Regions:
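Catalytic loop of the DD-peptidase/beta-lactamase superfamily, centered on the K-T-G motif
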Residues: 1-118
Length: 118
């Protein structure tokens, strides 16, 4: 669906206000957080109403969402156990599986998380 123009500050302000129930009611936020488990091949990812939940062995639960298209990736995550936010926009992205997607989705995120939490 594309079409949203933003930056890391706006994404942070939006996600923080959402997680603190400043944008919607607490009951609506609870509905968004009522997640369902994905198929076995995505065992660490769950989805709610517009929110994605990722379980990381070291850093715990991440709540947020990401998006990508050819040449661009953005992600906005909240780590409630650490009360920390990870938000980035980069000029690299692909919509197909492969080494570039893995580099961005796994290696890049892991490098940032290790600096953020260690």
């Amino acid at each position: 669906s594309h079409g949203v123009v933003s930056n890391v500050v706006d994404l942070y302000m939006f996600l923080k206000a959402l997680m603190e129930a400043e944008l919607i009611s607490e009951s609506s936020l609870d509905l968004m957080k009522d997640y369902t488990k994905e198929p076995e091949n995505l065992s660490n990812i769950k989805y709610g109403l517009g929110l994605e939940f990722r379980q990381h062995d070291i850093y715990g639960t991440a709540i947020g969402h990401g998006g990508r298209s050819s040449g661009f990736t953005s992600e906005a995550w909240y780590y409630p156990e650490q009360n920390a936010y990870l938000i980035y926009c980069i000029n690299a992205g692909t919509i197909t599986n492969g080494p570039v997607k893995r580099l961005i989705d796994e290696d890049f995120r892991e490098a940032i998380l290790s600096k953020l939490f260690n």
